[in-house]
Every structure is written in structure tokens, then in C-alpha cells.
């Protein structure tokens, strides 16, 4: 089987590519100015080819924060109901978000996710399924293992810390808080042919927890040991 080409090789329009770059530049200014985002682990990101990026979910800013943490273009999933709310719906559609059913069971979303992974792109998912109620890593839902198995791409674990302090679920608007992102070593399914889905779920959970602990410790050092 031929190796997947880098994501930049695919035929998005010039307008689409320029819009993505503009939004990335704008969001980067926001993230650096308001959230002092710091990222560790760039060396773990595959230089080319598809990868499934799995991250914890602390707040509504997470897709932006993870997207900015990678130098390659990032695809992300969004509930189909969000596309009906203008201007948010138009914005996420313009950024090539993949619509999924509210319960995450839609075949069209799964097929599009697999298509983008197999053509060599990065796709971000939040396997916890919803935002954390207290900022900690919640139990992962097993659905992402199907995507990983069918695509055969590496799984890249990522952890965010500080998003919960910036915008917890019970707060209407975001606030200022330093953000730390930790990118972990990719999990290669080609080396785990004898691992079943339950064991894979445990492995991914352990790797994400390791990343989360590193991100939390690094953020605490930046904040003088305080959670702010």
C-alpha cells in the first residue's frame, strides 16, 4: 500500500487555505496574549501522513488551543447542531469541521473522518465525549478505537491544562488563564496487532494521563504552584 501523502497535497481552494491561515494567525495572537499558551512535544507529531489526535476536553477553547499546538493543519469534529447557529455554524463550516450526530453515531461523520485520515491529514477528537466537570481527565468513550483501527494511523495523545480555569462549564464567558499543552509519543497500531480494543483504550488512557500530569506540573511551575 502506498504511503499517504502530506496533508498539504490535497486540493483545497486557495481561498480556503488563506482563510485557515488567517484564522490561525488571529487565534495565535489571542492564545499568546490572553492565555500565554506553551506547547511541549512538537517532536512527537508525524511530519506527514494521517494521525488521530486524541485530547482531553476542558473548555470550548480546546479545538483552537490544540489546533494552534500543531504546525500542520488540523481537522476537528463538531456536533451537527452547531452548524445551524450563525455565525458559529458558518465559521466552523469554513474551517472544514466534520459534522457528527449529537451522540457521535452518524455514519457520514465517521466516513468523512476516515477519508481525511487516509488521505494523510490530522483529525482531532475528544474521546471523553464532553467537557470535564472539574478539569481532570474523565473516562474515555471507546468509539475512537473503531476509527483508529479502520484507518490504521498513529494515535497522538495530547493533554491541555488551564482550559478549565479559563472557561469552566458553569461560566458564561472565558477568562484569562495560562494554558499548557503536552503532546505525547504517538501510539503505533502497527506494533499492536495482538491488542484488543479494551487494552487499546487502557493504553490510550494511560498515555493521555501521563501527558495531563506533565502539563499540570509544568503549568503549576509557571504559576508558582497555584492553580489559576
Model-predicted segments: where are they?
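A transmembrane-helix-recognition feature enriched in membrane-embedded lipid enzymes
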Residues: 2-41, 47, 72, 85-95
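Short, basic, glycine/proline-bearing loop/turn elements
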Residues: 26-28, 94-100, 127-131
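Non-catalytic C-terminal accessory region of glycerolipid acyltransferases
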Residues: 1-18, 108-228
Amino acid at each position: 500500500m502506498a504511503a499517504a501523502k502530506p496533508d498539504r497535497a490535497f486540493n483545497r481552494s486557495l481561498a480556503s487555505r488563506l482563510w485557515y491561515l488567517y484564522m490561525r494567525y488571529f487565534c495565535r495572537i489571542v492564545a499568546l496574549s490572553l492565555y500565554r499558551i506553551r506547547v511541549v512535544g512538537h517532536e512527537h507529531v508525524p511530519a506527514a501522513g494521517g494521525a488521530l489526535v486524541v485530547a482531553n476536553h476542558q473548555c470550548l477553547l480546546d479545538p483552537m488551543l490544540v489546533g494552534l499546538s500543531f504546525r500542520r493543519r488540523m481537522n476537528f469534529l463538531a456536533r451537527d447542531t452547531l452548524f445551524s447557529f450563525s455565525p458559529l455554524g458558518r465559521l466552523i463550516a469554513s474551517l472544514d469541521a466534520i459534522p457528527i450526530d449529537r451522540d457521535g453515531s452518524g455514519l457520514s461523520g465517521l466516513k468523512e473522518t476516515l477519508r481525511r485520515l487516509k488521505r494523510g491529514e490530522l483529525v482531532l477528537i475528544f474521546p471523553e465525549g464532553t467537557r470535564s466537570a472539574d478539569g481532570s481527565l474523565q473516562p474515555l468513550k471507546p468509539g475512537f478505537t473503531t476509527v483508529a483501527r479502520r484507518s490504521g494511523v498513529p494515535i497522538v495523545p495530547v493533554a491541555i491544562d488551564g482550559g478549565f480555569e479559563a472557561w469552566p462549564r458553569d461560566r458564561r464567558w472565558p477568562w484569562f488563564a495560562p494554558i499548557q499543552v503536552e503532546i505525547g509519543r504517538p501510539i503505533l497500531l502497527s506494533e499492536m496487532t495482538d491488542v484488543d480494543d479494551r487494552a487499546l483504550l487502557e493504553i490510550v488512557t494511560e498515555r493521555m494521563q501521563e501527558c495531563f500530569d506533565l502539563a499540570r506540573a509544568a503549568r503549576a511551575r509557571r504559576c508558582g504552584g497555584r492553580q489559576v
